[in-house]
Amino acid sequence: MYAKGMITSDIEAHIQELYGLSVSDSTVSRVTDKILPVVKEWQQRPLESVYAVVFLDAIHFHVRSEGQIVKKAVYIAIGIQMDGIRDVLGMWVGENGSAKFWLSILNGLRNRGVQDILIACVGGLTGLTNAIEAVYPRTEIQQCIIHQIRNTARFV
């Protein structure tokens, strides 16, 4: 919440509303001061050079922002290493994805060491396929089977 621009008193009120817990501004400040460097380090950590599969998708949430309920998306990249170990490569909060957005995400993965992705499993998000083809041109792109079933069911 702090990283997204909420001030400590807003976070305090949010925690009170959601969980019924009372925390002071100073407690929120101390927690964020300790957590932010750890989160930043995780977001910038080096990644494997090759992933067998990378899943790219979004989860949509309704959240309260400035007194209104708005829809936000958390975009996520989960990789499966060549030895089968799963790894959350990153999570990004946004309102809508675009080719430019996905290019920045994929270039960020490349800058963190990902040189090749064998298969990208995607959920049909706007601009994602074009961004993958631009950054990782040899990657096979496979639409997620769940998304295929949902899309097909609309026509049955």
Spans of features found by a protein language model:
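RNase H-like nuclease fold core
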Residues: 14, 18-126, 130, 134-138
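Conserved pre-catalytic core of RNA-dependent polymerases
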Residues: 1-2
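Short, charged amphipathic recognition helices of the HTH superfamily
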Residues: 5-15
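Short, surface-exposed amphipathic charged segments that create phosphate/polyanion-binding patches used
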Residues: 70-71, 154-156
